[in-house]
A protein has these predicted regions:
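C-terminal TM-helix exit segments that contain a strictly Trp-centered aromatic cap at the helix terminus
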Residues: 215, 301-306
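Generic detector of multi-pass transmembrane helix bundles and their immediately adjacent loops
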Residues: 301, 314-486
Length: 486
């Protein structure tokens, strides 16, 4: 670790060796209290206007009749003046680089081996606006932005207690990306907080561009269909999860907050659930559960029944399916797989392409799948109808899009190759994957395994919010209660 020298020229030479060829590196030599010095910063990250206003103008008024050495000027600025300097100076080159790349300005003085830091960040970032991926009718419209400090302030404004802890650190990556671990110390399990803190400190991702990059370290082990973490771009949702004792991880440069541990039932909840009546919220949750199982199993059930158990279908429906399939060259399950894959290709194209071309994709996909495929006899109308229903139903629970898509394809394959046996195998594999998933010792199906009557409280159905508020919910207390009774 290279310590700062008392020689200003040596310190500037070391900085020039690191950043001398960078276009945004800025170094301005000044004389402060009769002592030579230099202000170093990165243009565009630190605000020059704020720097001149807060530091140089005040120094110019005072330094005309004062002559100090470097050490004396350092002590006076840090402890005996009104200059807005940080309380912690920098004493080595790594600390200096970290402050500069965070958008701060550093004052180096001749004869002083420490630098004075000024918080004059002028970073440009996306404004706080409503996230497009999480819509709601009522409640807060704020969303996380890309700057970590702004996101932490949004959380602090909602959770206005002295129990909210926000621990910031730098990840061991090539970019030294900053992240923050947030929790409420009176609600979170201290052992789990220490465990997650140690995991984050020991993680070695090559890059850290989003909070999801930490998941392989937080949840090591074999591949799994369901990932027991939750992502949100809404500070209100993150604040609610903190009050439940959960942990929130934020990464600089990403508006997505990682919440863990996450529960399967939370994928069917939203902010509007608690702003509506209990009856209507329960109806919507039942509808979401139905939509999820519909998008996973409907194509497989359709293939299984139409190919292996046609006697279960009404005669008129069976005749129409049979007539449509005779006009197509592919087996029914291969046709269903082809339609599902085409829909996924269209979705991916619409997601990645420029927004100005989105209408063109919709028009072309409607002509190809909706009209041309049927007219040429490559696909049948019943198959397209079933695949379209499942494609729409999956967006009711966007947090389960990835496992639902993989399960749908696997169910169609097993149902087409093995019939009812394959369909049953797919269903039991789905249940086994759910039951075997956990995070930080909390089962993914919690709180349903816990003895707390989930159907009548805040599970598939929801009780009145006034009644829920009397009991409260803390995920670690529920876990311990379940262990004691089991």
């Amino acid at each position: 670790m290279q310590q700062l020298s008392q020689s200003l020229a040596e310190n500037l030479s070391a900085l020039d060796a690191r950043f001398g060829n960078s276009a945004d590196y800025y170094a301005k030599k000044i004389v402060l209290y009769g002592c030579p010095g230099c202000i170093v910063l990165f243009d565009g990250m630190a605000s020059l206007d704020s720097l001149w206003e807060l530091l140089l103008e005040a120094a110019g008024r005072q330094s005309a009749s004062v002559r100090l050495t470097g050490a004396q000027a350092y002590a006076h600025i840090l402890h005996g003046s009104a200059f807005p300097a940080e309380s912690t100076p920098v004493q080595d080159m790594s600390q200096l680089v970290a402050r500069l790349t965070a958008g701060m300005a550093v004052l180096l003085l001749e004869g002083c081996s420490s630098g004075i830091v000024f918080s004059v960040q002028g970073l440009k970032f996306r404004s706080v606006e409503e996230p497009s991926a999480e819509g709601n009718l009522r409640g807060s419209r704020e969303g996380f932005t890309d700057l970590l400090r702004v996101n932490l302030s949004l959380l602090r404004r909602l959770v206005r207690t002295d129990t909210l802890m926000q621990e910031a650190a730098q990840a061991h990556t090539c970019c030294n990306t900053e992240y923050a671990l947030c929790y409420c110390k009176d609600r979170a399990d201290p052992a789990m907080v220490q465990r997650v803190r140690a995991i984050l400190q020991s993680a070695r991702p090559e890059l850290l561009l989003d909070s999801s990059y930490f998941v392989p370290w937080l949840l090591p082990g074999k591949a799994r269909l369901f990932t027991p973490v939750h992502y949100t771009e809404r500070p209100a949702v993150a604040a609610a999860k903190l009050c439940e004792g959960k942990l929130v991880i934020l990464v600089n440069g990403s508006p997505s907050a990682l919440v863990l541990p996450a529960l399967f039932s939370e994928q069917f909840e939203c902010l509007d659930d608690y702003a509506s009546t209990a009856v209507f919220s329960s109806f919507l949750r039942v509808l979401k559960y139905f939509s999820f199982y519909l998008t996973v199993f409907l194509p497989g059930v359709f293939v299984c029944v139409a190919v292996y158990l046609p006697e279960l279908l009404p005669p008129q429906l069976l005749y129409k399916i049979e007539a449509a399939e005779k006009a197509t060259p592919l087996p029914l399950f291969a046709e269903m797989l082809l339609v599902i894959l085409l829909l996924e290709i269209i979705r991916e194209a619409g997601l990645r392409m420029p927004q100005s071309l989105g209408h063109s994709v919709s028009l072309v996909s409607a002509l190809i799948i909706g009209d041309a495929a049927i007219a040429t006899g490559l696909m049948s109308t019943p198959v397209i109808f079933v695949a379209s229903i499942t494609a729409i139903a999956v967006f009711v629970t966007p947090g389960l899009y990835e496992p639902a898509t993989l399960l749908r394809i696997g169910t169609v394959l097993l149902a087409g190759l093995a019939g009812p046996v394959g369909l049953a195998a797919a269903f039991f594999g789905f249940l086994l994957s759910l039951v075997s998933t956990e995070a930080l010792g909390v089962p993914y199906l919690a709180p349903h395994p816990f003895p707390q009557q989930p159907l009548s409280e805040d599970g598939v159905l929801r009780r009145n919010y006034r009644q829920l508020s009397r009991q409260g919910f803390n995920i670690w207390q529920k876990r311990e209660r379940g262990k004691r009774r089991s």
